[in-house]
């Protein structure tokens, strides 16, 4: 029996008190005052937000499990400094842990990181360790541009990131490369910034040789890999011009794309261009695009329909829906095996 595992979910409709505390935290930082205590949020409040949104859609669309992380647009590491980013990340990750505890058969946790633009990765390493070792999380979201749309951080191949990669390898967890909200008025967050960052991340990796130093490091580039599959020939050609090995050798044992692509022709192209072993089912439901496609009558983000419609073998479909995700997230695989799955 095949499981349908969605590798890309965010907690986008949250208890009101959580969002209110965030606004209070930001206001307190601006005023030079300590943030108020985090509010008490009941299990029932969490259940209400999940049952009315992600859990309902998971059941309606025929999936089994979602890998769940904090709301991407609200990670906002560019707000404040480490005194803001660390407690915010902890609060968001703790909320994800509570969702997983309430619905352990349906959700697995992935953490956000307190990546203030001026900070090194020390606090992020500590939060990753806490979330994996204490909360049972299976991965993280790594922001390649904590400044929010100006791309001033070193490329992902730079040694700035190496201490964090070392911890990822030690814990055997992957990272989804995921930016947050845009503070650049020329760059719409979900329509421009997300897709640009996905593409930029891939090109950064192409220009270096990161996986020679970290052969077991694993990255998921979301939103179908940005522009990469559509311009696969360009990237193959650039690798050749830069005297790099082929993409299959240089990157594609370590880099994976999800299926957060919101129309059938786009998914068809992804599956045609990218090797089956590198594609993970994802939807980012109740996320960037929440409406119904008037040409199909179905939600744009109901990506399972697109995978179901692909002209591929049952074995290839199983790999996209389950097998690849269990391979990329070995801690999830261990949890499922412990349940006899």
UniProtKB/Swiss-Prot annotation:
InterPro entries: ACMSD, Amidohydro-rel, Metal_Hydrolase. The active site is at residue 284. Keywords: Aromatic hydrocarbons catabolism, Lyase, Metal-binding, Zinc. Contributes to the degradation of lignin at the level of the protocatechuate 4,5-cleavage pathway. Catalyzes the hydration of the double bond of (3Z)-2-keto-4-carboxy-3-hexenedioate (KCH) to (4S)-4-carboxy-4-hydroxy-2-oxoadipate (CHA, also named (2S)-2-hydroxy-4-oxobutane-1,2,4-tricarboxylate). Is involved in the catabolism of both vanillate and syringate. Its EC number is 4.2.1.-. SUPFAM superfamilies: Metallo-dependent hydrolases (SSF51556). Homodimer. Binds 1 zinc ion per subunit. The metal center contained within the active site of LigJ is not used to activate the water molecule but is utilized to activate the substrate via polarization of the carbonyl oxygen. This is 2-keto-4-carboxy-3-hexenedioate hydratase. Pathway: Secondary metabolite metabolism; lignin degradation. Zn(2+) binds at residues 8, 10, 178. Its cofactor is Zn(2+). The keyword Metal-binding applies. It catalyses: (3Z)-2-oxo-4-carboxy-3-hexenedioate + H2O = (2S)-2-hydroxy-4-oxobutane-1,2,4-tricarboxylate. Changing residue 194 to F: 7.8-fold reduction in catalytic rate. GO terms for cellular component: cytoplasm. The gene is ligJ. It is an enzyme of class 4 (lyase). One of its GO terms (molecular function) is metal ion binding. Signal peptide: none annotated. The keyword DNA repair does not apply.
